[in-house]
A protein has these predicted regions:
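Conserved acetyl-CoA-binding loop-helix of GNAT-fold acetyltransferases
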Residues: 91, 97-111, 133-137
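Helix-loop element at the rim of GNAT/NAT acetyltransferase active sites that forms part
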Residues: 20-34
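Active-site rim helix/loop that mediates acceptor-substrate recognition in acyltransferases
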Residues: 31-53
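Conserved beta-strand-loop-alpha-helix junction that forms the acyl-donor binding cleft
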Residues: 122-132, 148-152, 159-160
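Conserved N-terminal entry element of GNAT/NAT acetyltransferase domains
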Residues: 1-13
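Conserved beta-strand in the GNAT
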Residues: 53, 59-70, 85
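Conserved acyl-donor/pantetheine-binding loop and adjacent beta-alpha core of acyl/acetyltransferases
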Residues: 68-87, 93-97
Length: 160
């Protein structure tokens, strides 16, 4: 039986799961801001941000947020109208290293591209080679180092 990823809109009922994931050492290394949970829960109804729980064959294992590029993304430079940004993490440690990061990111973005989104951007820490490799496997290309409110980031882009 083939495996497939599903993307369910996140609800307030998912917050205990996301809180547990944020406490996992492999997530906390990169999502360590103490206000992260507050930002995630406070943005559940934000019109420019969609948040999802990613599942594989019915098992939740990751968090994904997709957002409209806005004024606070000036460090990304000029982007085509309709460009979206993406952030994600795999919460379940046993799902690391199996190609799931690049797999679900590619599946999600391919779906957006069929809806007319022209470009996706992502901005991992330049010190996170695992994430950078997953994004490259998902079709992203390195664009350059940018300064963000969270510090230096590697801007990566994937065009439709």
């Amino acid at each position: 039986m083939a495996s497939f990823y599903t993307f369910r809109p996140m609800t307030a009922e998912d917050m205990p799961l996301v809180q547990r994931w944020l406490a996992e050492p492999h997530v906390a290394e990169w999502w360590h801001d103490p206000e992260t949970l507050e930002f995630i829960s406070g943005d559940l109804d934000h019109h420019d941000l969609a948040q999802f729980i990613v599942s594989l064959d019915g098992r939740p294992f990751a968090y994904l947020q997709c957002y409209q590029i806005g004024d606070w993304h000036v460090s990304f430079g000029p982007q085509p109208e309709g460009t979206r940004g993406l952030d994600q993490f795999i919460g379940e440690a046993d799902m690391l290293g199996g190609g799931h990061g690049s797999g679900f990111i590619r599946a999600f973005i391919d779906r957006l591209f069929t809806r007319g989104i022209p470009r996706m951007v992502i901005d991992p820490s330049p010190d996170n080679p695992r994430a950078i490799r997953a994004y490259e496997k998902a079709g992203f290309e390195k664009s350059g180092i940018v300064d963000t409110p969270d510090g230096p980031a590697l801007l990566m882009v994937r065009d439709a």
